[in-house]
Amino acid sequence: MIKQRTLKTPVKATGVGLHSGVKVEMTLRPAAPDSGIVFRRVDLEPPAELKADPYLVTDTRLCSMLESGAAKVSTVEHLMSALAGLGIDNLLVDLTGPEIPIMDGSSAPFVFLLQSAGIVEQNAAKRYVRITRPIEVRDGDKWARFVPHHGFKIEFTIDFKHPVFDKSGKTVTIDFADTAYTKEVARARTFGFMHEVEYLRNQGLALGGSLDNAIVMDEYRVLNQDGLRYDDEFVKHKVLDAIGDLYLLGHPIIGAFEAYKSGHALNNALLRELLQHREAWEFVSFEHDEDVPSAFLRLHPLAA
């Protein structure tokens, strides 16, 4: 059968929160089958646990924040994206602060950390959510939807009025049956504009942001000395975010995700809409490799 996965050994990283600017130590630990992804605020007394769950997402200004009682964990989407990309089902994430460290603004450092710790299979069947009917949410001209598809595919379009975006791709279609997440998506960094920085900081956001962990643009160009990592890095980062936001469902999705100008709020609204329509999805597990959509066999090679 296709089995659930966790880490072989614990692994640690330290960094600053993109929005809080606070230094945080994060420890990723193996977890039991069927426990899902659980964040633990070990700096609180008593320590607070927050499970990856679409209904715990409260603040979606520029990131996805989980909140339960007095405990919050923000900017979970890049780590969640790496976990989805590597097919990790169960994990404990111990944090000494309110935010996942931003690292370099992409999910590549998390992919490296997870692969360094080693990934192991567990004696329990992996449960997928298979989309059986289209589900869509809209907000003005923005929209996001799931449609049935035997695999995992994302089509995303962004629309920013800025000279840099005219040169970069605005639409990307990624079918994971023939594309590796770690190679084509994981290195895409978060991005922002100089003119927004002052406003964001007054709102208590982006306090840890810098050219080391984001693509920053003025009115005309990218300010980072090394330029872009992919020609279409902006829209690929939106794909990276979406993969992380959607993995808050707690299961890999068999289906296609299509979006126009979607962000954390709409991604979360789509998950909640899906859960409201029990007839639009089903749980599936696979006894044999040959029954699994090739997107998932390719997405999740087991580390040696």
From Swiss-Prot:
GO terms for molecular function: metal ion binding; UDP-3-O-acyl-N-acetylglucosamine deacetylase activity. The gene is lpxC. It catalyses: a UDP-3-O-[(3R)-3-hydroxyacyl]-N-acetyl-alpha-D-glucosamine + H2O = a UDP-3-O-[(3R)-3-hydroxyacyl]-alpha-D-glucosamine + acetate. One of its GO terms (cellular component) is membrane. Pathway: Glycolipid biosynthesis; lipid IV(A) biosynthesis; lipid IV(A) from (3R)-3-hydroxytetradecanoyl-[acyl-carrier-protein] and UDP-N-acetyl-alpha-D-glucosamine: step 2/6. The keyword Transcription regulation does not apply. It comes from Thiobacillus denitrificans (strain ATCC 25259 / T1). Zn(2+) binds at H78, H237, D241. This is UDP-3-O-acyl-N-acetylglucosamine deacetylase. One of its GO terms (biological process) is lipid A biosynthetic process. The keyword S-adenosyl-L-methionine does not apply. HAMAP family: LpxC (MF_00388). Belongs to the LpxC family. Its EC number is 3.5.1.108. InterPro entries: Ribosomal_Su5_D2-typ_SF (IPR020568), UDP-acyl_GlcNac_deAcase (IPR004463), UDP-acyl_GlcNac_deAcase_C (IPR011334), UDP-acyl_N-AcGlcN_deAcase_N (IPR015870). It is an enzyme of class 3 (hydrolase). Keywords: Hydrolase, Lipid A biosynthesis, Lipid biosynthesis, Lipid metabolism, Metal-binding, Zinc. The active site is at H264 (proton donor). Catalyzes the hydrolysis of UDP-3-O-myristoyl-N-acetylglucosamine to form UDP-3-O-myristoylglucosamine and acetate, the committed step in lipid A biosynthesis. Its cofactor is Zn(2+).
